[in-house]
Amino acid sequence: MPAGGRQEEARELFAPLGPTYDRVGAVLSLGQDPLWRRFLVSRLPPGGHVLDVATGTGLVAEELLKRGFRVTGLDQSPGMLALAGQRFGHRVELHEASADALPFDDKSFDHLTVTYLLRYMDDPRATLAELARVVRPGGLVASLEFGVPGGPARPLWELYVNVGLPLAGRVLANGWNEVGGFLGDSIRDFWARNPIERQLEWWRDAGLSDVQVRRLSLGGGVVMWGTRI
């Protein structure tokens, strides 16, 4: 999970939820989150060393291992990293650090994945540039974020995030009622401030080319990926 400002708020909110994160996260996304994560990983060409940023309990890292990648995971939450360590043992090298100050040299990794991070960062443009810094030329950076559906799906999305998410969070597990109430505002605010055209500028400014965008599940999930120049 991410960490000062929006980062600190998110870290404090999610920190105690590690033991139930995988199960409840899948339910709150109506079963879509695992599908989105698999699609994210499928964007990468086979082989190589991948840095998985905001690795959390290791859901994306696990998909990367299944596809034969060497994986390094990074997160700011020691609790989440402890759960990832239990999941992987020595199969994944784990680091506790901030995504906007990575403890790696330039061009250290073949590819990079990042999940549900940028909307929590105080300067997402600078964070994306920092992520791209550690990827070798020709490598891919791939990001998964929650999105805001358009068209006829928008009213249904608003109903779900305003009523369904908080209620479901309250029923499913302790602590998740606050997350349910927090997520809708967080997602809506991020996309209002940062429409896709602005985000594409971030990617280009970070030295990423051929940037592609795929909206999944009527726009509830958004995967972006681009090649490091």
Report the location of each language-model feature.
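N-terminal, positively charged/glycine-rich alpha-helical extensions of SAM-dependent methyltransferases
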Residues: 1-20, 161, 172, 176
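A short acidic, Gly/Pro-enriched loop at the edge of an enzyme's catalytic core
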Residues: 100-112
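C-terminal alpha-helical "lid/dimerization" subdomain adjacent to the S-adenosyl-L-methionine
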Residues: 148-202, 212
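Conserved alpha-helix/loop element of class I SAM-dependent methyltransferases that forms part
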Residues: 30-47
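Core SAM-dependent methyltransferase catalytic element
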Residues: 207-229
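Class I SAM-dependent methyltransferase SAM/SAH-binding core
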Residues: 49-101
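A short SAM/SAH-binding and catalytic strip from SAM-dependent methyltransferases
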Residues: 110-124
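A short glycine-rich, Lys/Arg-flanked "PGG" loop and its adjoining helix->strand segment in the class I
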Residues: 125-140
